Design a protein with these regions (language model features):
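Charged, amphipathic alpha-helical segments and their flanking helix caps
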Residues: 1-32, 44-150
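A short glycine-rich, His/Asp/Glu-containing loop-to-beta-strand
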Residues: 36-40
Length: 150
């Protein structure tokens, strides 16, 4: 049995989203200076659930595993003034749409059986922090994964 956290993270990082860099779990920068960028959150894996599909010893029993992968979009550095806010919200909304379109259009998903935006796929839209705590306009994305193991 092997869960595919690294494989699906690689698959998501390889998505093509116009004007956005997507980082893998081993590529998270210490700052958000190369924006727009999508990075895994520190609580990258949440809502882990395991359902046994058959009985038997753990190494051979069929199981369905579901979990949520959490990412943060850093769009532009937060600044003062109304024009910065309007520019940020327009551009941020566009990048959110492009990323979700790319996820929904994945014909081949390496590592999992299914990958879809969560029910609450977008949270914290507005001011978010980069890894170094600098403030950016951005949001968090949540993607639900489903794997069959063994």
């Amino acid at each position: 049995m092997a869960l595919s956290f690294t494989t699906i993270s690689d698959t998501i990082a390889a998505l093509s989203v116009s004007g956005v860099t997507i980082k893998d779990i081993d590529e998270v920068p210490t700052s958000g200076d190369r924006v727009p960028i999508i990075i895994p959150l520190p609580d990258f894996i949440t809502n882990f659930n395991l359902d046994n599909m058959t009985l038997g010893v753990p190494s051979t029993r069929l199981m369905t595993v579901s979990y949520t992968l959490n990412y943060r979009l850093l769009f532009i550095r937060a600044g003062a003034g109304r024009s910065n806010t309007i520019e940020a919200l327009n551009g941020l909304t566009s990048k959110i749409g492009l990323f979700l379109d790319a996820v929904l259009a994945m014909d081949t998903i390496t590592g999992v059986e299914d990958l879809v935006p969560s029910t609450n796929a977008i949270t914290n839209m507005g001011i978010v922090n980069a890894p170094n705590d600098d403030a950016y306009y951005g949001c968090d994305f949540h993607l639900d994964c489903l794997e069959h193991v063994n």
